[in-house]
Amino acid sequence: MSEQSKDLSDPNFAAEVPDCEMQDSDAVPVGIPPPASLAANLAGPPCAPEGPMAAQQASPPPEERIEDVDPKILQQAAEEGRAHQPQSPARPIPAPPAPAQLVQKAHELMWYVLVKDQKRMVLWFPDMVKEVMGSYKKWCRSILRRTSVILARVFGLHLRLTNLHTMEFALVKALSPEELDRVALNNRMPMTGLLLMILSLIYVKGRGAREGAVWNVLRILGLRPWKKHSTFGDVRKIITEEFVQQNYLKYQRVPHIEPPEYEFFWGSRANREITKMQIMEFLARVFKKDPQAWPSRYREALEQARALREANLAAQAPRSSVSED
């Protein structure tokens, strides 16, 4: 059997994932013993003694063989026995979960996979079922596909089946090594997706993004401002302190507004290390759209890419002239 890795986002993958449904085998019904009415019919009518000495000389009547009994009597007795047999209640068929429940499970599996990958632990399918899916095992294919799509769009990762025999999975980085080195944030890959999501929102807004708008987007990923997360911990502290201290974000109060509101801007380090075209590619991957779906932002990204290319050519020109001399 080939152990070639397979992407879960591939629609052909569904045919290769083992069936997640568990088939329960019902007990085979056993034969029904003949009821008392059948024994009475087989015994026949009692024989009355004849004469004064008949009681002593009478012998018991010969037993009637079952082959000599009218088949209608047997059928009637069997139906009577089935009528008195207690019937086991039918097992209710579970209703399929709502799409929102499958999405929630997909988010739970996404964070589970990210944590396992950070700890350099093997991703086994049975562990996913036991620790995350639980009673949703019948819908494991749908949950795996949704999880793979979220990982690819948000974090630039692919969830691949690396060994079909042992059902071992692995996370494969979809971004190029140069892009990963530029925004890896000390090799904490989940942080990359979190940062790119916020920077993308700021870029689409044009100048800055209010804190409320940022949290509306992060809630889609299951992140809450005042709730500890299994992967990130204190998410609010990360985006308002860590990213700010690393100069990836600016976090400023909006003037002349009560109660106080805050907004995010690109930091100096983000402007140096992350290009607008990379943000456009990230948005296209997340929303499954062409970058030209944001025409003004796409033109701006093209202009920046052209300017960077010209600057690189200008920087290389003196070196080439010196080498020729």
From Swiss-Prot:
Pfam families on file: MAGE (PF01454)
Subcellular location: Cytoplasm; Nucleus, Nucleoplasm; Nucleus matrix
PROSITE patterns linked to this entry: MAGE
Organism: Mus musculus
Protein name: Necdin
InterPro entries found in the cross-reference section: MAGE, MAGE_WH1, MAGE_WH2, MHD_dom
Tissue: Brain specific. Not detected in other tissues. Expressed in postmitotic neurons. In adult brain the highest expression is in hypothalamus. Highly expressed in thalamus and midbrain. Relatively low levels are in cerebral cortex, hippocampus, striatum, olfactory bulb, cerebellum, pons and spinal cord. Also detected in neurally differentiated embryonal carcinoma cells.
MAGE domain sequence ranges: 102-301
Keywords: Cytoplasm, DNA-binding, Growth regulation, Nucleus, Transcription, Transcription regulation
Summary of the function given for this chain in its UniProt record: Growth suppressor that facilitates the entry of the cell into cell cycle arrest. Functionally similar to the retinoblastoma protein it binds to and represses the activity of cell-cycle-promoting proteins such as SV40 large T antigen, adenovirus E1A, and the transcription factor E2F. Necdin also interacts with p53 and works in an additive manner to inhibit cell growth. Also functions as a transcription factor and directly binds to specific guanosine-rich DNA sequences.
Subunit structure: Binds to the transactivation domains of E2F1 and p53. Binds also SV40 large T antigen and adenovirus E1A. Interacts with nucleobindin 1 and 2.
GO molecular function, one term: gamma-tubulin binding
Classification of source organism: Eukaryota, Metazoa, Chordata, Craniata, Vertebrata
GO biological process, one term: axonal fasciculation
SMART domains assigned to the protein according to its UniProt record, in alphabetical order: MAGE
GO CC aspect terms: cell projection; centrosome; cytoplasm; cytosol; nuclear matrix; nucleoplasm; nucleus; protein-containing complex
Stretches the record annotates as Disordered: 1-69, 77-96
